[in-house]
């Protein structure tokens, strides 16, 4: 495939994914209809299969796109030198990114699509995003896998509680820094004892 043809194909895929996100914002991530998507992008539904061999392939492209957006957000961060402050800023960016777009949050951080699992290539992007947080946790003194799991679970729990009970607000997410401090202090204290 020549560069021009490949570039046009990639541009078409990107535009289809953009429209799929618009539909997901309107109908929820599980509410995307391939028929409606085809209509919105000006093609017949069977023509979508030239770009995505299944609805799961579309979700996979969206999963990759969302995680690329997240990684771009992280790459733009100016992190402070202090490890604890850097971790808080990184996790705040994670939470803010999730709260900005409920449909994207559903696909990237929750399990709203029965049977969907991202491809290894797409999942590697999610692992890279989480890997940045884990690196900062290590620098802040959180090195035990159980302690890392607690920070991840706490962050995800705040996102879920916020999205479910106070979308657009900050009732739960405003406690992020306080809970990060508690978990870091606990992890450091327990590591000193052992």
Where are the regions that the model predicts?
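Amphipathic alpha-helical segments used for helix-helix packing
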Residues: 99-117, 160-166
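N-terminal intrinsically disordered/low-complexity leader segments
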Residues: 1-11, 191-194
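Helix-turn-helix
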Residues: 15, 19, 23-57, 61
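Amphipathic C-terminal alpha-helical segment
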Residues: 152-170, 184-193
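Short hydrophobic clusters on alpha-helical segments that form packing/core surfaces
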Residues: 16-24, 66, 70, 94, ...
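Alpha-helical DNA-contacting segments of helix-turn-helix folds
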Residues: 59-66, 108, 125
């Amino acid at each position: 495939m020549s560069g021009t043809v490949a570039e046009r194909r990639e541009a078409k895929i990107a535009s289809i994914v953009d429209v799929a996100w618009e539909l997901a914002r309107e109908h929820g991530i599980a509410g995307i209809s391939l028929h409606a998507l085809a209509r919105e992008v000006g093609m017949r539904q069977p023509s979508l299969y030239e770009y995505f061999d299944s609805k799961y392939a579309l979700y996979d492209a969206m999963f990759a796109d969302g995680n690329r957006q997240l990684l771009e957000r992280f790459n733009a961060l100016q992190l402070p030198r202090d490890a604890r402050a850097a971790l808080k800023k990184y996790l705040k960016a994670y939470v803010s990114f999730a709260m900005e777009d409920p449909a994207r949050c559903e696909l990237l951080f929750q399990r709203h699509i029965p049977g969907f699992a991202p491809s290894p290539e797409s999942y590697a992007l999610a692992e890279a995003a989480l890997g940045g947080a884990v690196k900062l946790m290590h620098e802040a003194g959180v090195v035990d896998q159980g302690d890392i799991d607690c920070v991840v679970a706490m962050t995800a729990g705040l996102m879920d509680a916020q999205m479910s009970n106070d979308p657009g607000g900050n009732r739960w997410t405003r406690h992020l820094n306080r809970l990060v401090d508690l978990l870091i202090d606990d992890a450091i204290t327990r590591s000193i004892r052992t």
